[in-house]
Amino acid sequence: MKIALLSRSRKLYSSRRLIEAAEERGHEIQVIDVLRAYMNITSHKPSIHYKGEELEGFDVVIPRIGASVTFYGASVLRQFEMMGVYPLNESVAITRSRDKLRSLQLLSRKGIGMPVTGYASKPDDIKDVIKMVGGAPLVVKLLEGTQGIGVVLAETQKAAESVIEGFMGVKANILVQEYIKEANGADIRCFVIGGKVVASMKRQAPNGEFRSNLHRGGSAEVIRITPEERSTAVSAAKIMGLNVAGVDLLRSNHGPVVMEVNSSPGLRGIETATGKDIAGMIIEYIEKSGKVGKTKTRGKG
């Protein structure tokens, strides 16, 4: 197969591993920087150009699109879909999962466990927003934040009011969520491929920190998940429409709660913690499922 890997750099761990896995299995793979690709939006003959040449003959496209380039990256991916190239994750699923509020609304509609969450822009009554999610301590999140950036734990009522007022002052849209104290600063990353959890790890926040993101100094170790956690992760990925996803869960007193569904999960942490060849599993999934023209939306999303 001829595979297009949408990535800003072939030197990134996840990109490097996918290239290795594809080439080991005899596939041709080309790394394409989405920001350097440009498109011809023409009726009946959509095309993508890169470095002065038209991109042709691809069977599969693997999107590794960073959050900061979601809009343009999804546009390039959508163009591939319109050309009949099979996407590992479809553009509509990626944009859906990147919208934190939309994701939570979809998950709640299907009855997936989640922390009690409020959404606000300029609430008239901040105290009522805080009361709505059960009071302090609580977590305030920027809607557009990633890797733990823009996430604040407010431990008291006064702190919560100050944080919310501060975000409002810079005209930021925020999520206000209950703090799952019983999780003890740990979350579970479930790696889902093709409707199955193929690996899972526990990420633990360092002392004095509540965010367990590896980018923030958290540690990771392999963990055995429960059947309910497995089912929740698979369902969350399916609701988002993602073939490959990193589903982040917390263990709460009322069962597993989904914190985020990541459409472009990193491979370094999960491969290091579990010792599994996740990149190889992704390529194997593509070999079984990646048929030209087999795109549910054909770029209509």
From Swiss-Prot:
Keywords associated with the record: ATP-binding, Ligase, Magnesium, Manganese, Metal-binding, Nucleotide-binding, Protein biosynthesis
GO molecular function: ATP binding; metal ion binding; ribosomal S6-glutamic acid ligase activity
Binding site for Mn(2+) 2: E260, N262
InterPro entries: ATP-grasp, ATP-grasp_RimK-type, ATP_grasp_subdomain_1, RimK, Rimk_N, Rp_bS6_RimK/Lys_biosynth_LsyX
GO BP term (any one): SOS response
Location of the ATP-grasp domain: 104-287
Top-level taxon: Archaea
Residues where Mn(2+) 1 binds: D248, E260
Keyword Amino-acid biosynthesis set for record: no
Cofactor note text: Binds 2 magnesium or manganese ions per subunit.
Cofactor(s) the protein requires to work: Mg(2+); Mn(2+)
One Gene Ontology cellular component: cytoplasm
Enzyme Commission number: 6.3.2.-
Residues binding Mg(2+) 1, per UniProt: D248, E260
Enzyme class: ligase
Residues forming coiled coils: none
Binding site for Mg(2+) 2: E260, N262
Positions bound to ATP: K141, E178, Y179, D187, R211, S212, N213
PANTHER family named among the record's database cross-references: RIBOSOMAL PROTEIN BS6--L-GLUTAMATE LIGASE, RIBOSOMAL PROTEIN S6 MODIFICATION PROTEIN
Similarity comment: family membership: Belongs to the RimK family.
NCBIfam families cross-referenced by the UniProt entry: PRK10446.1, rimK_fam
Protein name: Probable alpha-L-glutamate ligase
Organism for this UniProt entry: Methanococcoides burtonii (strain DSM 6242 / NBRC 107633 / OCM 468 / ACE-M)
